[in-house]
């Protein structure tokens, strides 16, 4: 079976390399940096949905002395421990809180993270109690099972292991040294920090300046509501900051007459704060998730927006995006109309994003958008997409209305149909795929490839050999389509490159993974012209796969 690169081409639609100043919660891919595991030397880009989960971290109580006695001491001069399958259980079992990076030596993003991670480890050694950072080469054969156990799908993946390894979560913090230190110090403490009734105004100021902060207000710090709040804080602490108090008057926009119990979520967007008095744990989680996310996500260079951007692209629902120049004289008018559309149609499971064209270059390349068509509205649904180029502010609401009513025609990305197509391996594009493959009445072997994929480059001469060998058979076509430059119809499940499908003249569509010219020719010979349901097709597919 051919090894495959993930089907999503580079670059991802978020900033590809944040500056030191902008490396906040951005993990250019855990959506990252997040390249999926791949062949050494070929850094495979993870898809947008690849969406590795980011979660939490917390208190560490083991003394650093235990670390010095562990069999896997860090290399001389290194603060980061080096672990492997042989000592992982022993070292993790000696700590109530330990941070582990799963990396690959050939991964460029891992190499960028390394000095920041090392600096953070050195700084956290003096924390009371010390916070331990470790690393595992997940690409080494010895450690592949270990990586699988911890759900590693991309490099680097950082995991937080608690209670001597009994619980683990993905790291959800910044990737610069200072950010790592601050995040882990906070996570190593209690899930929610108490704000004393006698707190000075700076306590309120810190809440106002900390992004989304969830504050529980209680008559006393006990009872079922308080316990429910603390349980949710423990579960969601990776993504949100939690505080609690018995005096609402110390809070921003506080009111000493409010006695609680209630939860007040502060945020730097939309209505600035919102309250809830439902302490059912599931309901409280949903309240925090929905209220703590902007009605419209902003795609710009601000570090504060990166975590919302990541969550936006992780979401599997329909996405509506407005791209324009934020320096445009009418930018505010566009914002107003787009926010109105979001307020009207968010209930239709549509999430909204407004992006500055300068900051969104990755998105333009990823989605095949054209800067010359800005301002534009781009809607990405599960199996189709829609583009409204050079849109006017007053056209935004009607366009969204048409989409929700199902009257818009989908946009199909396609390269131009070749004027000359006389090579042994024929070129197929989205606009002529049905004609060449499904409606030609011929037996067609179609490869979906990516120009940057090394595995595809190795397959190319093999397909050329097959095409030349079968050139005298007018009923056989060997073809290829660039899956990064053309939309792939839902008839095909292309999850990696190369992907091959054989469509027989009898109407059978079969996935195939031949390795050699001989195998591919034999497969085509056995299956060409077969009718649906014929035994030869079923048996030959079993033989080949």
Swiss-Prot record:
GO molecular function terms listed in the Swiss-Prot or TrEMBL record: protein disulfide isomerase activity
**Which reactions does this protein catalyse?**
Catalyzes the rearrangement of -S-S- bonds in proteins
What are the site positions for Lowers pKa of C-terminal Cys of first active site? 175
Q: Which CDD domains match?
A: PDI_a_family (cd02961), PDI_a_PDI_a'_C (cd02995), PDI_b'_family (cd02982), PDI_b_family (cd02981)
Q: Which cysteines are joined by disulfide bonds?
A: 107-110, 453-456
InterPro entries recorded: Prot_disulphide_isomerase (IPR005792), Thioredoxin-like_sf (IPR036249), Thioredoxin_CS (IPR017937), Thioredoxin_domain (IPR013766)
The residue numbers the entry assigns to motif Prevents secretion from ER are 542-545
Major localization listed first in the record, in broad terms: endoplasmic reticulum
Instruction: Give the annotated active site.
Output: 107 (nucleophile), 110 (nucleophile), 453 (nucleophile), 456 (nucleophile)
Q: Which UniProt keywords apply?
A: Disulfide bond, Endoplasmic reticulum, Glycoprotein, Isomerase, Redox-active center, Repeat, Signal
Chain segments annotated as transmembrane: none
Output one GO BP term: response to endoplasmic reticulum stress
Enumerate the residues marked as the site Contributes to redox potential value: 108-109, 454-455
Q: State which Enzyme Commission number(s) the record gives.
A: 5.3.4.1
Annotated region (Disordered), positions in chain? 1-24
Q: Locate the compositionally biased regions of type Pro residues.
A: 1-16
**Localization in the cell:** Endoplasmic reticulum lumen
Residues the record annotates as the site (Lowers pKa of C-terminal Cys of second active site) are 515
PROSITE patterns hit by this protein: ER_TARGET, THIOREDOXIN_1, THIOREDOXIN_2
Q: Where is the Thioredoxin domain?
A: 55-189, 403-545
**Where is this chain glycosylated?**
87, 349
GO cellular component terms, alphabetically, are: endoplasmic reticulum; endoplasmic reticulum lumen
Primary role? Acts as a protein-folding catalyst that interacts with nascent polypeptides to catalyze the formation, isomerization, and reduction or oxidation of disulfide bonds. May play a role in storage protein biogenesis.
Instruction: Return the similarity comment.
Output: Belongs to the protein disulfide isomerase family.
Task: Report the protein name in the record.
Answer: Protein disulfide isomerase-like 1-3
The species is Oryza sativa subsp. japonica (Rice)
Q: Gene name on record?
A: PDIL1-3
């Amino acid at each position: 079976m051919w090894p495959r690169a993930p089907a999503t081409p580079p670059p991802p639609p978020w900033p590809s390399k944040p500056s030191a100043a902008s490396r906040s919660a951005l993990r250019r891919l855990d959506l990252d940096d997040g390249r999926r595991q791949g062949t050494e030397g070929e850094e495979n880009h993870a898809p947008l949905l690849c969406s590795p989960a980011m979660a939490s971290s917390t208190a560490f109580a083991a003394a650093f002395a235990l670390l010095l006695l562990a069999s896997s001491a860090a290399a001389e001069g290194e603060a980061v421990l080096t672990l492997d399958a042989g000592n992982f259980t022993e070292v993790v079992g000696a700590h109530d809180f330990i941070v582990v990076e799963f990396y690959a030596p050939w991964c460029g993003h891992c190499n960028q993270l390394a000095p920041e991670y090392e600096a953070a480890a050195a700084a956290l050694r003096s924390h009371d109690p010390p916070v331990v950072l470790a690393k595992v080469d997940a690409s080494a054969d010895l450690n592949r099972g270990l990586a699988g156990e911890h759900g590693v799908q991309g490099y680097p993946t950082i995991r937080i292991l608690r209670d001597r390894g009994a619980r683990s979560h993905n790291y959800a913090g910044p990737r610069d040294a200072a950010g790592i230190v601050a995040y882990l110090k906070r996570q190593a403490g209690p899930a929610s920090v108490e704000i004393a009734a006698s707190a000075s105004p700076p306590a309120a100021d810190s809440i106002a300046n900390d992004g989304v902060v969830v504050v529980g207000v209680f008559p006393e710090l006990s009872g079922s509501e308080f316990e429910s709040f603390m349980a949710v804080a423990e579960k969601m602490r990776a993504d949100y900051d939690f505080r609690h108090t018995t005096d609402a008057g110390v809070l921003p926009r506080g009111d000493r007459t409010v006695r609680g119990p209630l939860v007040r979520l502060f945020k730097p967007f939309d209505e600035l704060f919102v309250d809830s008095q439902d302490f059912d744990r599931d309901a409280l989680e949903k309240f925090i998730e929905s209220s703590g996310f902007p009605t419209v996500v902003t795609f710009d260079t601000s570090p504060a927006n990166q975590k919302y951007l990541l969550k936006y692209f992780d979401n599997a629902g329909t996405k509506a995006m407005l791209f324009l120049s934020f320096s445009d004289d009418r930018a505010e008018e566009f914002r107003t109309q787009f926010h109105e559309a979001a307020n009207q149609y968010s209930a239709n499971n549509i999430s909204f994003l407004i992006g500055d064209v300068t900051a969104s270059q990755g998105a333009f390349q990823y989605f095949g958008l054209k800067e010359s068509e800005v301002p534009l509205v781009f809607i990405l649904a599960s199996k189709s997409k829609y583009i409204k180029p050079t849109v006017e502010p007053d056209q935004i609401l009607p366009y969204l209305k048409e989409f929700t009513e199902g009257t818009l025609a989908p946009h199909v990305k396609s390269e131009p149909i070749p004027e000359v197509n006389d090579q042994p391996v024929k070129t197929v594009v989205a606009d002529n795929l049905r004609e060449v493959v499904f409606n030609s009445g011929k037996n067609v072997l179609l490869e979906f490839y990516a120009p940057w994929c090394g595995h595809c480059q190795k397959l190319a001469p093999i397909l050329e050999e097959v095409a030349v060998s079968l050139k005298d058979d007018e009923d056989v076509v060997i073809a290829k389509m660039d899956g990064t430059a053309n939309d792939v119809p839902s008839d095909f499940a292309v999850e990696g490159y190369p992907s091959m499908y054989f469509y027989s003249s009898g109407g059978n569509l079969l996935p195939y993974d031949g390795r050699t010219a001989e195998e591919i020719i034999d497969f085509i010979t056995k299956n060409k012209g077969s009718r649906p349901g014929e035994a030869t097709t079923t048996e030959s597919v079993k033989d080949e796969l």
